[in-house]
Every structure is written in C-alpha cells, then in structure tokens.
A protein has these predicted regions:
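A sequence/structural signal for flexible, mid-protein segments enriched
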Residues: 2-223
Length: 223
C-alpha cells in the first residue's frame, strides 16, 4: 500500500503588483480582427520569517469576458475566455541568477543544455530581508471583431497566483523542467532523475498553499 506525508508551508505575501509596460498590436484576417496584448509586471513579494529555505511557483491567469450580439439573430450573449501563462525569462529568481536580455546573443556551448523554467518555480535565495521584486511577462490574444458577432464590450482581469510548495515538489518540477529540454539522443547529456516521496509508489505527493491578487485589465473602450 502506497502512502506519503506532506507539509503545508506558509504562503508568500504579495505586497504590490503593477503593470510597467503594456503593448498592443492588431492582426486582421478575412473573417476577424484580433488584438495581441503583451504585458510586463513588477510584483513585490515578502516571505514569512523562517529558519529554512522556502520554495514557490507562480502563474498568471488572464480572463476576458465578451458581451456579444449575433449579427443575424440580434441575440445577445456572453462568452468567457481564459488563459494561464506567464514567463520569467527576465527575472533573476526564476532564471536562477541568469536572467535573459532582449538581445541575448551570448555564445552557448552546444553540449551544455539551457534549462527553461516551464513551471515557474523559484526559491528565496535572491530575497533580501525577506523581500524581492519579481519581473513577469504575460501575453494574450483576444477577438475584437468578426463577421458572425458584433462585440459590444470586452472586460478583462489578471489573477497573479503564487503557491508555497514543498522542497520535494520544487525538486520534482525542476526535474520536469530539465526533462522537457532533455535530448535522449545526446550521449553527453546526463539522464534526468525524478525525486520520489511516496513510500510504495512513484511520484510526488504535495499540498500547495496559494495566495493571489486580481488586477483589472483594460476594457475594449480603452483601445
């Protein structure tokens, strides 16, 4: 019989979240008109005071609500579109001390793989006095107009989500990051080993402790 134990860790505190840059571009087809939105975030964080290292992961959930009118039937309706995605490519903690730059053309030795942080995990190693300001990028494509529906209004919100995770889950997700970039045909690459904390089984049992903040995004009237 498989069994496992997990510790629930204290959540991180979001002190402040701001958008420092937001860019929009239009994309038009014969059937529809889309807006592509890219946003850069600065998020000030504070960890609880403890005598051990702390581990987290982050994501951004963006939701847009459409108020629509069918051009043929004139019937009104509501549609909701949601996307979970963000990038920490330019952040020190999420890139483990090696953030990217807009023109990152440094030579990289081919047989040393560059690990991407697909699961957006990090620890408190880069925090000072329990505080840190994180840089995140998010993007979203949403429909502005099409032939079938007249879009009367679009409202959006972003929910920035942080999860306090266990050391075991942190190591597991780091291994998953490495595995996603692993080239099994390259004999010079070390095989990825996944940690396990389930007695009599395989995998990771973990309980995450979430905290989040919601920020309204621009509505269609603002464009």
């Amino acid at each position: 019989k498989a069994n496992a134990e997990a510790t629930v860790y204290e959540p991180i505190e979001i002190i402040k979240a701001d958008t420092i840059e937001s860019n929009h571009s239009l994309s038009e087809t014969s059937e529809s008109l889309w807006i592509y939105q890219a946003t850069k975030w600065k998020i000030k964080l504070q960890t609880p005071t403890t005598n051990h290292s702390q581990y987290y992961r982050v994501n951004i959930k963006q939701t847009y609500t459409y108020r629509l009118t069918n051009r043929k039937t004139l019937q009104d309706s509501t549609a909701i579109s949601t996307q979970w995605e963000c990038s920490g490519y330019y952040d020190t903690a999420l890139m483990d001390g090696k953030p990217g730059t807009p023109n990152n053309s440094d030579p990289i030795i081919n047989f040393i793989p560059t690990i991407n942080n697909y699961y957006n995990v990090f620890n408190d190693a880069y925090f000072t006095n329990n505080q840190y300001t994180m840089t995140l990028d998010s993007w979203y494509s949403f429909l502005l107009d099409n032939k079938l529906y007249k879009i009367k209004k679009i409202t959006g919100k972003a929910i920035i989500q942080y999860y306090a995770i266990s050391p075991a889950e942190y190591q597991y997700l780091r291994a998953a990051n490495a595995y996603a970039d692993h080239d099994s045909s390259n004999l010079l690459e070390t095989p990825v080993i996944f940690p396990n904390n389930i007695k009599g089984g395989i995998g990771i049992f973990a309980i995450e402790n979430p905290t989040e903040t919601s920020i309204p995004l621009k509505s269609i009237e603002d464009y």
